[in-house]
Amino acid sequence: MIEAVDLHFCYGDAEVLKGVNFKAERGKVTVLMGRNGAGKTTLLKHLNGLLRPKSGKVIIDGRELKYDRKSLLEVRKRVFYVFQNPDDQILSPTVWQDVAFGPRNLGLKGERLERVVRNALEAVGLSGYEKRLCSTLSGGEKRRLAIASALAMNPDYCIMDEPSANVDGEGLRMIAEIIRKLREEGKGVVVSTHDADLAKEVGDYFYFMDDGKIVWEGEEFSYSVARKLGIRSFSLGKVILAESKIDDHPCFSADELERAVLKAFEGETVVVLGRDDWVIKELEKYPLEVERL
């Protein structure tokens, strides 16, 4: 497990992380969502030591992260970070050289190295690209190349910052398959994304950030609410829970309740007729003000 405990971090005088607590387990996909500027990338860069907190700590499989050169090199073999901008990660002239860079540094060579690179490129749909110049790839192809480099390292944890950005439908399907495969292999995967469809498809646990803080977390979350929280501000309305005065008024359906919740997340005040136990239980999942009449 990777655990961030009470992380604080500043860029100059601006506090970007404000006491963040976060966990990512092996064999699970942990999804991090929130609007731009919420602090997601800053948090992710702490998980393998790319950034050092002002206070707080990061614990990886029971051991607190140390920041000397030797410790960081070991951590980055086990916790691979796929950058939001793949150009920040691509270091070599050709596709083959870039994917081979990490495994070579781990001592792989010959047929074993060839096999690792070949399998990684095949997994991301870049077979046949070995001799291509990285500079000639499209944005989506560069992103898949960055993921291939992660696969070739065979890390215990893989952190993906916005892996679906600039990727077409086929590329997105492939990325989702890769994430699922990593989970099946027992890897811990952390995905930061604005894509609620991808989050719903692959996520096992969800965190939502705003203004440098975790504002919601849970194992299950509505697709529509996740989308709203992922790309909108957290200006919330109110739900008024009222008893129906009409004896034959039908029970509130799940779809109706979800629409009401979405309106509340948009800042509206909505009235929900009926106080069925399931309605009350559903409303307790959301950080909304609920008033009973």
Curated annotation (Swiss-Prot):
Residues 2-236 form the ABC transporter domain. Pfam families: ABC_tran. InterPro entries: AAA+_ATPase, ABC_transporter-like_ATP-bd, ABC_transporter-like_CS, ABC_transpr_CbiO/EcfA_su, Co_trans_ATP-bd, ECF_ABC_transporter_ATP-bd, P-loop_NTPase. Its main location: membrane. One of its GO terms (biological process) is cobalt ion transport. GO terms for molecular function: ATP binding; ATP hydrolysis activity; ATPase-coupled transmembrane transporter activity. It is an enzyme of class 7 (translocase). ATP binds at residues 34-41. Coiled coil: none annotated. One of its GO terms (cellular component) is ATP-binding cassette (ABC) transporter complex. It is a peripheral membrane protein. Its EC number is 7.-.-.-. It comes from the Archaea. Keywords: ATP-binding, Cell membrane, Membrane, Nucleotide-binding, Translocase, Transport. It is found in: Cell membrane. Belongs to the ABC transporter superfamily. Probably part of an ABC transporter complex. Responsible for energy coupling to the transport system. This is Putative ABC transporter ATP-binding protein AF_0731. It comes from Archaeoglobus fulgidus (strain ATCC 49558 / DSM 4304 / JCM 9628 / NBRC 100126 / VC-16).
